[in-house]
Regions:
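N-terminal secretory signal peptides that target proteins for export/translocation
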Residues: 1-4
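Extracellular/lumen-exposed scaffold segments
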Residues: 24-280
Length: 280
């Protein structure tokens, strides 16, 4: 009778506990899924105390995929985690993109092997269900559907063999501007945006601009330089009631393996002191 009473009490306590999803088996990576001309898989790990998942993508030579702002041509990646249980995924963290000139305006994206990282929030256990679409492009752009499930707990993420891969993707994000690489000034002369980019050991630089919904921007070109700075011009136009001067724009600046993301206010070019850069 005493044993029965203990069993009944234990059962009552169990029923009173909040429902917690318990994974049957920890799974911190999925199998590689081949879908010509790319393959992909999901991985997960804990990095510096934060849980992350990542979509790893490998593209065949000559193929590309896209950044969150794909540019004049391309498809913006889309991801959905609403079918997940016990875990919530944050907005994707993108590596710094490259610009590819396809002859029709160009696009911003990646080639080879890379991926997209998602910060995770969960208590003890989680089942992460990812569905999405990424564009892959060569001569034509093709939407490629991706889907995979991971099941894990905190101990599994802490012991995951994918910590290094996710850390590498996190480090590939655009960094904060610093003396090593920074937009020194941004101005508009009525025809073009003028950017002065400075830094250390600069051989060349490239710029990607994130325009507003009423902006039309051309391709940047280097028009001047000195020992530690480049002057770039970007043909620009915006609606009269959305002037560029006084507004903040976002730029990605790349110098080799280094990349920064910087928000900077556009000033009236006629009011700025002229930079002593040699025009090309």
């Amino acid at each position: 009778m005493f044993a029965l009473r203990i069993m009944m009490t234990s059962a009552a306590l169990w029923l009173a506990l909040p429902a917690v999803f318990v994974p049957a088996q920890a799974l911190v990576d999925g199998p590689w899924i081949d879908m010509e001309p790319a393959r992909y898989r999901m991985i997960a790990a804990e990095v510096d105390g934060q849980a992350y998942a990542a979509l790893e993508v490998e593209l065949k030579p000559g193929w590309h995929t896209y950044w969150r702002y794909p540019g004049a041509s391309g498809l913006e990646p889309e991801f959905d985690f609403t079918e997940s249980r016990g875990v919530a995924a944050g907005k994707p963290l993108f590596p710094a993109p490259y610009f590819f000139d396809d002859g029709v305006g160009g696009f911003n994206g990646y080639e080879g092997r890379g991926g997209f990282v998602f910060p995770l929030r969960f208590e003890l256990n989680g089942e992460l269900n990812m569905r999405g679409m990424i564009g892959v492009c060569r001569e034509v752009c093709v939407p490629m559907e991706v889907a995979q499930k991971l099941v894990f707990n905190r101990d599994g993420l802490a012991a995951s063999p994918h910590r290094g891969a996710i850390k590498t993707l996190l480090q590939a994000q655009p960094q904060e501007p610093s003396d090593d690489l920074v937009i020194r000034s941004a101005s508009f002369d009525g025809v073009s945006l003028q950017l002065v980019v400075s830094g250390t050991a600069l051989e060349t630089v490239s710029v990607i601009t994130i325009p507003g919904p009423h902006d039309i921007l051309g391709l940047p070109r280097i028009v001047g330089r000195d020992e530690d700075a480049f002057l770039l011009e970007i043909p620009a136009w915006s609606k009269l009631d959305h002037p560029l001067i006084g507004r903040k724009l976002t730029f990605i600046v790349r110098a080799g393996a280094r990349a920064i993301e910087q928000n900077i206010q556009v000033r009236d070019h006629s009011l700025l002191p002229q930079e002593p850069l040699t025009r090309q």
